[in-house]
Amino acid sequence: MIDEVIKEGYTMIIMNLELDNIYGFNDFRINFSYPKKIVNSNIPNEHLKDCPKFRYKKAVILMGANATGKTTLGRALLRIFGIIETGNPNYFTQMIRDKNKTARICIEFINGEKILNRLTVSLEKDKSNSLLASIVYKYESAPIRPTDTYEKVLLKMKTQKLDEKMLSVGLTPYTGQIFYSFALDNEENNHQTYSTDPKLFLKVLKAVIGTLDPSLKDISILDGVENSYVIRRGSQEIILQNNKLVNQNLLSSGTVRGVDIALLIASIIANERGFYYCDEHFSYIQTDLEKRMFGIMIEHLQEDEQLIFTTHNTDMLDLNIPKHSYAFLSRNIEGDEIKTSVMYASDVLKRNTDSIRCAAANDVFSSIPDESLLDSLSED
């Protein structure tokens, strides 16, 4: 059992996200509120601290067939956070799928104070000259009172005037600082630098890596080198420095992923990031271990924190967590456009006895891939 870390955590909750002409998302919306209190839930405190009626989904398992946008959604969020922190418009323009059309992102989130923030960034075409376009920022906010619901706060949102000169250094003067950690392949700066006690991270690293590869029991802090650890297997030494493996070719794919998993779990235990996104990091790891480590993550999630966890593992459908914790992405081609949509298990399965696994197996959530093209490979 990991020792409890006594530390006041950071608030970071996403309530709503809208994307239009962003990567493969057109007119897309995903919402993280839920209407009804769940009795005896295994995920406690799914509401804003001291605001019991302001409910949010604290842990979300995001599923769907290949190429439905699970990883891309994480990339979009990472770049949106980049916009908030730096004001750099390139984070926005790099996401636009078709630059000849308008594009838009809109995110609602809570961080720090009990204030609902809404940031909208859009690419708008000049009405007199379609070749000209401009990026428009809009920021709205509203205070959250102890008796407020999410829906009630939406009615109070007010536009705040933005100083264009300040936009060049980011929107945090308006929104406050944001806190997050991503485990996302092929992305730089997934894990923000955080101050987790090296002894805590070492303990988590030993537990995770030692479970994935029992031959890796000798793990220690590398003396004299900041933020560095050495993993030993006999005469071999694998160095982990600044969250990156120097010679990862000596480890299995699952063990390499385990380092990112350990970083994420340590961050959650220390309550230092607030928002966490774990994207398909258990593809090379046994299903029972995925379930166990996900359980550890939600066990240590504190009030006003949030985890989005993407996976293809259908065994995750058997977890004893609320139905509203499951969301399914699907993607269809409508004319010349790719349409990505989300379906929440709780919107379809209303009875306590309804099985999410059975519903998924019967493609209720449109999450089963179309295998018809493979039929030609089986023809005589």
Predicted stretch roles:
Residues 283-285, 316:
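ABC ATPase nucleotide-binding domain "signature" loop
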Residues 2-16, 292-380:
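C-terminal lobe/lid and adjacent interdomain/linker elements of RecA-like ASCE P-loop ATPase modules
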Residues 275-277:
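Walker B motif beta-strand of ABC-family P-loop ATPases
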Residues 279-281:
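Walker B catalytic acidic pair
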Residues 286-287, 291:
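Conserved D-loop-proximal element of ABC-family nucleotide-binding domains
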Residues 2-78:
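Pre-Walker A-like glycine/lysine-rich segment at the N-terminus of P-loop NTPase domains
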Residues 69, 254, 285:
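Conserved glycine(s) of the Walker
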Residues 2-31, 81-271, 356-367, 376-380:
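Phosphate-coordinating catalytic segments in nucleotide- and nucleic-acid-processing enzymes
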